[in-house]
């Protein structure tokens, strides 16, 4: 397991016990264990509202560009085109721990480099951790606009703690590897 006291993305100090940067939401601790990957990929129903994670989900090269400075970090992003093809006909809400000052450039880059059209997006406005931040946006924006019927939603989310938060609301939340093939490195 690798621990950081300095965030590799924003270079802010974090205590050794933090799993995610308090400033930008970057994952700080990576387990060396292999994640369980479904052999038979799941379908994504077209009637679902997709609650989409940005880093480590839509972005395919988050780890290699984690040290890049803005705006280069945005310009160097590559996307999971197999995932994009599976969700491009859904209503997609991007909810990310990325800082709000990156929103306009990030959305422009996604639009210019994929067939995905983000219907709504919600960003980190401070030092919020991903699960707390995404729960905030879920309760403040998503549920008031779209209702709180969990069967309407599917969250595609890299962060296990955030998937657990969605589960509190009975929203199915899965990592991208349940839907697409893992790239061989």
Give the residues covered by each predicted segment.
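Flanking scaffold residues of small Cys/His-coordinated metal-binding clusters
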Residues: 2, 15-16
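Short, non-ligating residues that shape and space the ligands of small metal-coordination modules
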Residues: 16-17, 30-31
